[in-house]
Amino acid sequence: MYDLDAVIVIYAVEGNPADQQRALDHMAVLEQAGHRFAISDLTCTECLVPVFGPGSGQRLSDFFRFFHGPNLRTLGLTAAMHARASAIRGRHTYPAVPPAQPKRYGLADALHLAAAIEFGCDVFLTNDNQLANFPDITVEVLP
């Protein structure tokens, strides 16, 4: 099962045409290969922040249609996921650009990774190169 980072969902639902096509094409290939997808409640929250406002009804409907897709599970965040996110932030860093002291993963990224691991996902799909070398789950950067 592939856990989808919020940016992948945003690309798939309303990304610029090139990013949207990349996301939809890659997800279609994965689905044809028999893979299923998961998102967390946090992913839903991140995706919906910019859509709550005047005149955003269609955008909101588009996201909810995606969230209720037949090949997608939504995971509630658990205490175990929060504990693992704390451990990720405490134990893991990524190289800073330009080179400086390594940086700790942000809370949202740590929660996304923790949710994917705790739920038993095989891969975390993102477009964030800073997550690519995280060691506890396979991280795939959108091609």
Where do the PLM segments sit?
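Active-site-proximal, substrate-binding regions of enzyme catalytic domains
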Residues: 24, 42-44, 48, 52-92, ...
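Active-site regions of enzymes building and remodeling cell-envelope glycoconjugates
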Residues: 136-143
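Active-site neighborhoods of divalent-metal-dependent phosphate/nucleic-acid chemistry enzymes
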Residues: 73-127, 133
